[in-house]
Amino acid sequence: MSNIIKQLEQEQLKQNVPSFRPGDTLEVKVWVVEGSKRRLQAFEGVVIAIRNRGLHSAFTLRKVSNGVGVERVFQTHSPAVDSIAVKRKGAVRKAKLYYLRERSGKSARIKERLGA
């Protein structure tokens, strides 16, 4: 039975997901339904957490909009997610960057990762 479930989940995995790490800045385009219309909405932020669970994988993006911190969790393989683009690679030494929630301004900056 579990082989059938694994096979179905394998078929639903997206193949065009770029590799990214915590600290990277991503732009995620998501389909948003407003009434009877569908449109793409872009969300650009820093990856503060990644949860790798196969089909149930997710990542958390954080950005500051009008002085207010906004965090959004995206399911990596969701059909609502249209595209994921890596804008900038960040150099960090932790897997979870929850400490950025308490920081603002220059102390919340992340160095750029150079090279590979």
Swiss-Prot record:
Source taxon at top rank: Bacteria
GO terms for biological process, alphabetical: translation
GO cellular component: cytosolic large ribosomal subunit
Signal sequence range: none
InterPro entries according to UniProt: Ribosomal_bL19, Ribosomal_bL19_CS, Ribosomal_bL19_sf, Translation_prot_SH3-like_sf
SS bond list: none
Keywords linked to the UniProt accession: Ribonucleoprotein, Ribosomal protein
A Pfam family it matches: Ribosomal_L19
GO molecular function: structural constituent of ribosome
Functional summary from the UniProt entry: This protein is located at the 30S-50S ribosomal subunit interface and may play a role in the structure and function of the aminoacyl-tRNA binding site.
Record family assignment: Belongs to the bacterial ribosomal protein bL19 family.
Name by which UniProt lists this protein: Large ribosomal subunit protein bL19
Organism (species): Haemophilus influenzae (strain ATCC 51907 / DSM 11121 / KW20 / Rd)
Native organism taxonomy: Bacteria, Pseudomonadati, Pseudomonadota, Gammaproteobacteria, Pasteurellales
